[in-house]
Regions:
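Eukaryotic non-catalytic interaction scaffolds in large regulatory proteins
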Residues: 1-2, 6, 14-15, 19-31, ...
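Structural signature of alpha-helical solenoid repeat scaffolds
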Residues: 4-16, 72, 76, 138-139, ...
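Alpha-helical scaffold segments in carbohydrate-active enzymes
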Residues: 5, 37, 66, 73, ...
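Extended, noncatalytic alpha-helical scaffold/tether regions
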Residues: 6, 10, 30, 38, ...
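Alpha-helical repeat/alpha-solenoid scaffolds of the HEAT/ARM/MIF4G superfamily
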Residues: 14, 22-25, 41, 45, ...
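Short sequence/structural elements of tandem HEAT/ARM alpha-solenoid repeats
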Residues: 21-37, 48, 81-94, 98-113, ...
Length: 226
């Protein structure tokens, strides 16, 4: 399948700069729609391996990984005017203003929907896709323009998605018993999920919400409400 190579190639073109064409709506909108369609694609079970490690490496999930990564990269590098380096403001200032107001809200909506599906058990997410979701949400916390879109979902996002990543689950216990080196690699490796990075960027009031979550989880059945 060529799709994941196409998405990977596009991602690589954004690493250093965006061309005027890439910043135009004639290019950005259709590419954005493609990324959203790939992320939203419901993959039939018989189209991917049953083994989760093999599924991580299959073409469909590589395509999804590059879709998540590219959307996050566009926002983090070029699309957030409040975090744009002064050396880039002249070339990308206008693009960032447009991106954060028109495109970033759609990315947030799509990512939140995938998290909702994941925590409710309706879809599976690869570890690398989760990594890119965590990274994107971490980048969206500080800027007011994106934080106000995430804030209504904040408590549920932390309790249902972030906190479980920090918990020592039965699967992690088994891996610790059989291969502790692999467990450490997964938790601190380059592509490990980033709940810690998410937490570091929170204000004191937001941190108080997080601190109250573990006791509340012990007092009620596991559930999610979006």
């Amino acid at each position: 399948m060529l799709l994941h190579y196409i998405l990977k190639a596009y991602m690589k073109t954004t690493l250093i700069q965006l061309s005027p064409h890439q910043m135009s709506n004639e290019s950005l909108v259709p590419w954005g729609r493609l990324f959203f369609q790939v992320i939203d694609l419901q993959i039939p079970k018989d189209a991917v391996p049953a083994d989760e490690d093999e599924r991580e490496r299959c073409e469909w999930w590589k395509a999804k990984k590059w879709a998540y990564a590219t959307l996050g990269r566009l926002y983090r590098r070029y699309g957030d005017p409040s975090q744009l380096p002064s050396t880039l403001k002249e070339d990308y200032g206008a693009f960032a203003d447009s991106f954060v107001n028109t495109f970033a809200p759609e990315i947030i909506k799509v990512f939140l929907h995938q998290v909702e599906l994941y925590v409710s058990g309706r879809v599976w997410l690869s570890k690398k896709c989760q990594y890119h979701i965590f990274t994107f949400f971490s980048d969206c916390i500080k800027p007011k323009s994106t934080w106000h879109l995430i804030k209504p979902h904040f408590e549920t996002l932390v309790s249902s998605f972030v906190y479980p990543q920090m918990s020592f689950t039965h699967a992690k216990v088994e891996l610790w018993d059989t291969d502790p080196v692999d467990l450490v690699r997964q938790q601190v490796g380059k592509r490990a999920c980033k709940p810690a990075a998410f937490g570091f960027k929170l204000t004191t009031s937001q941190m108080m919400v997080i601190i109250s979550i573990p006791p509340s989880l012990l007092q009620r059945p596991s559930s999610s409400s979006w």
